[in-house]
Design a protein with these regions (language model features):
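Disulfide-braced loops of extracellular cysteine-rich modules
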Residues: 424-437
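Extracellular, cysteine-rich, disulfide-stabilized repeat modules with beta-strand cores
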Residues: 434-450
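Disulfide-stabilized extracellular ectodomains of secreted/luminal proteins, especially beta-rich
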Residues: 1-405, 409-417, 425, 448, ...
Length: 463
């Protein structure tokens, strides 16, 4: 198996991996530094983050909590010291990169200052003249939920639920006023009965134009938020999965057909993957009755241009309950795409917008191994297992560079590059190449090679 590995600095506790898109280079974000890793010439360069406001001696007190690649070498970063948060832009192409807030990020910088970002929280940046940052806060405190920072800061309403967020997805509506943010999370089940599940899986949705309610009722809090359970299981065997672990998104040309691949576990040591579309999620939010509530006449289900003008009696309805009675079912009301007795920790999916090619899933195991899984029209199966590390390890993140078919896997101590289109391993005969059923490989007439338009000739000539 073709692989390369580069160690991370000893003091580097990884936060995220970002693909640079050329020359086999990735950026590994740690607590204190960014590290540029070049797998072509196996070199690494450590980049300090000079936070602009504190004195140089205070820089080391800030931990990086948000890293987002805006364009080319321009990165948006946030860091916290446990009391306040700073955000800035860094141009990594500069000889000595500076950490300065750009004009369209200034509202984020000003509104987020007193907020403390927790490590590993999902976020989404809307990069525009009036940029907004959406970020979650997980835990059991009364202030958990989705936050919006920018020109109009919005916070979640207070509640007593324990929630842990695993993903945020921005909608791509043609009309900006209809754009939404979807968050996926698991919630501690308050029903502690003998047959009750410990966790419940949810999707929640807010509108990006939401400005909060009127004075005294949901002021500066979400008025557009609605929540729905995610269902994942085998109806015939009563085998259900409710602990949401991770999600990843495959975008479609028609936004409603965008697919969410959700990784679940259950209390019996099994994992499962269920797939949902934005269209099916939206259908529940548009049509389902609200849970434990009478008909809520006048309550908006679409985004409202000015939420501060919503009538007070409607705001009180929203404040009382935002959960739907019906659950979101997987695509075509199917069961899990995949379920087995492995403990998976992360999911990454490579799919085509129009499903022209088989979908490939990469799933990390709790021992550091990676499963490569193929999904075709009839079934889903594991076609390869990779061992990127020489020892048992916790996988921090997995990222695929689709053009090169290179998979980057990070642990707390190193980043490994795997060639997941290493087709020569299937031998030098057409039959062996085709029997491998690897969507990244095909027979070009002489050898098993990474798939191109000229390869993948399924029918083999008789000898």
């Amino acid at each position: 198996m073709a692989m390369k590995r580069l160690p991370l600095p000893r003091h580097h506790v990884p936060v995220e991996i970002i693909l640079e898109g050329e020359h086999e280079t990735v950026i590994a974000a740690g607590h204190k530094h960014l590290t540029s890793l070049n797998f072509q010439n196996t070199t690494s360069v450590e980049i300090s983050v000079p936070w602009s406001e504190p004195r140089p001696s205070e820089d080391r007190n800030f931990n990086i909590t948000v890293v987002h690649k805006r364009e080319a070498d321009m990165f948006f970063l946030c860091g916290t010291n446990g009391m306040k948060t700073l955000c800035c832009d860094m141009n990594l192409s500069e000889q000595t990169p500076r950490c300065l807030p750009s004009e369209n990020m200034r509202n984020i910088k000003d509104s987020i200052r007193e907020f403390v970002i927790k490590e590993g929280e999902p976020f989404a940046l809307v990069d525009s003249p009036d940029s907004d940052l959406y970020i979650t806060y997980s835990g059991s405190r009364e202030n958990v939920g989705i936050y919006k920072f920018g020109k109009n800061r919005i916070a979640p309403g207070r509640h007593s639920k324990e929630q842990h967020y695993v993903g945020l997805v921005l909608s791509r509506e043609k009309e900006p006023d209809k754009s939404k943010v979807y968050a996926f999370y698991r919630e501690k089940n308050k029903d502690q009965g003998m047959y009750s599940e410990m966790w419940l899986a949810f999707v929640t949705r807010v509108c990006t134009v939401d400005r909060g309610g009127s004075k005294n009722i949901l002021q500066f809090s979400w008025t557009s938020q609605m929540n729905a359970r995610l269902s994942c299981g085998h109806a015939d065997s009563r085998q259900h999965f409710s602990e949401l672990v991770d999600v990843t998104t495959v975008h479609a040309e028609q936004w409603e057909q965008t697919r969410i691949y959700a990784l679940f576990r259950n209390e019996w040591g099994m994992s499962a993957v269920c797939v949902y579309t934005i269209e099916d999620i939206e259908q529940i939010f548009k049509t389902s009755p609200f849970k434990d509530a009478d008909e809520q006449t006048g309550r908006p289900r679409e985004c409202v241009a000015d939420s501060t003008k919503i009538q007070k009696n409607v705001l009180k309805m929203i404040q009382m309950n935002s959960e739907m009675k019906e659950s979101v079912q997987p695509v075509d009301n199917s069961g899990p795409l995949l379920s087995n007795h492995h403990l998976y920790t992360h999911i990454h999916v490579h799919g085509s917008p129009n499903n022209r090619h088989p979908t490939v899933l990469f799933l990390s195991l709790n021992n550091g191994a990676i499963h490569k899984v193929m999904q075709d029209e009839s079934r889903t199966f594991v076609i390869a297992e990779y061992q990127p590390f020489n020892h048992r390890a916790h996988v921090v993140s997995i990222r695929l560079d689709p053009p090169s078919r290179k998979l980057y896997v990070s642990s707390r101590t190193e980043v490994v590059q795997l060639n997941v289109a290493n087709c020569s391993q299937y031998g030098d005969s057409c039959e062996l190449c085709v029997l491998a059923r690897d969507p990244y490989c095909g027979w070009d007439g002489t050898r098993c090679t990474p798939e191109t338009d000229a390869s993948n000739v399924v029918k083999c000539s008789s000898p």
